[in-house]
Amino acid sequence: MSPATVLDSILEGVRADVAAREALVGMTEIKAAAAAAPPPLDVMAALRQPGIGVIAEVKRASPSAGSLAPITDPAKLARAYEDGGARIISVLTEGRRFQGSLDDLDAVRAAVSIPLLRKDFVVQPYQIHEARAHGADMLLLIVAALDQSALVSMLDRTESLGMTALVEVHTEQEADRALKAGAKVIGVNARDLTTLEVDRDCFARIAPGLPSNVIRIAESGVRGTNDLLAYAGAGADAVLVGEGLVKSGDPRAAVADLVTAGTHPSCPKPAR
């Protein structure tokens, strides 16, 4: 029987890939590597700086758009992002649909000094220790991919390793689940991962219902400064930008434009 949704299909592949990696490097080994890694950087401090932060993403492809950019040198791209003023760099490590890898995470970690987000479909505890072992400071947890007990467990394990969890939601119900699990940083993805359809009003609906102490990240649809300002007006603390940057001719300048807009005195400030 074929998977019921796009997300189900992605998760099926992820589970197979995790099992293959764990067969090569066991849980005991990956836990030891995570423990031996340099301490994680302070993601919350980066997100709480004044203005709307930019999380810039290393992203070669996506299920919705297909191939975006070859990105033969992820370290060079990450340095351009850092030079442009990005606060955090997101690295997609899922291979089948996004053409990413843990090698990309390693390369970026060696190239920059700002926090890194490992963006993947985390369904096994193994992946959390793996993220830390490869230098991640922040880890994506997708509510739609986890039942509530797994979400709570994964969030606790992520934080126990000193990382910050970015808990992704698409609906008000998922936001409630994220809050009940104890999420401190919630990302709203305008794209429904079960269908790949986009609801651009999603963030504006969900963000006002989040407590003031929760960091709010808008995860989709930022093509330029107008989109950033719109999300800022709806309560975003930061935006995550991938496609718009990797397809730009000058990623450093593209990030810098967003950073300038996000820190300009006229930029709306999140209500707190």
UniProtKB/Swiss-Prot annotation:
One of its Pfam families is IGPS
Enzyme Commission no: 4.1.1.48
What InterPro entries is this protein classified in? Aldolase_TIM, Indole-3-glycerol_P_synth, Indole-3-glycerol_P_synth_dom, Indole-3-GlycerolPSynthase_CS, RibuloseP-bd_barrel
Q: Give the EC class as a word.
A: lyase
Pathway(s) served: Amino-acid biosynthesis; L-tryptophan biosynthesis; L-tryptophan from chorismate: step 4/5
Q: Does the keyword NAD apply?
A: no
Give the UniProt keywords, A-Z.
Amino-acid biosynthesis, Aromatic amino acid biosynthesis, Decarboxylase, Lyase, Tryptophan biosynthesis
Superkingdom as given in the UniProt entry: Bacteria
KW Lyase (keyword) present = yes
Q: Name one GO molecular function term.
A: indole-3-glycerol-phosphate synthase activity
* Alphabetical list of PROSITE patterns matching this protein: IGPS
Per its record, the protein catalyses: 1-(2-carboxyphenylamino)-1-deoxy-D-ribulose 5-phosphate + H(+) = (1S,2R)-1-C-(indol-3-yl)glycerol 3-phosphate + CO2 + H2O
Q: Which GO terms describe its biological process?
A: L-tryptophan biosynthetic process
Q: Which PANTHER family match?
A: INDOLE-3-GLYCEROL-PHOSPHATE SYNTHASE, TRYPTOPHAN BIOSYNTHESIS PROTEIN
Q: Which family does it belong to?
A: Belongs to the TrpC family.
Q: Can you say what this protein is called?
A: Indole-3-glycerol phosphate synthase
Source organism phylogeny:
Bacteria, Bacillati, Actinomycetota, Actinomycetes, Mycobacteriales
